[in-house]
Amino acid sequence: MATFLMFGKYTAQAMQEMSPGRTQKVRDKVKELGGEVKAIYAVLGKKDLLLVVNLPGIEAAMKASLTLSKMTGISFTTSPALPVEEFDKLIGQV
């Protein structure tokens, strides 16, 4: 499984449909797509949400991003993430 950071920005539609139950629906959908939500944070700044998810790969991440955007009205920007320990190993190989 690979780790992905999904940064969410609320749209007007997303604000109208906001509810505590939506969080569980997001967790369920990610699980249905073969992944796991490790954490969800509400954040201040240019983005409103941060999801830390484990997914099988880039295709699953794209599908999750598109599916969650369509389902919630939240606009997502998704980036792969690598644990710093793995990054340090890569540096040692350069």
Model-derived features: positions:
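Hydrophobic alpha-helical elements and their junctions with loops/disorder across both membrane
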Residues: M15, V37, L68-T72
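A short linear hydrophobic-aromatic micro-motif
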Residues: G34-Y41, F76-T78
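Short S/T/G/P-rich N-terminal loop/turn motif that feeds into the first structured element of a domain
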Residues: M1-K25, K31-E32, E36, L44-K47, ...
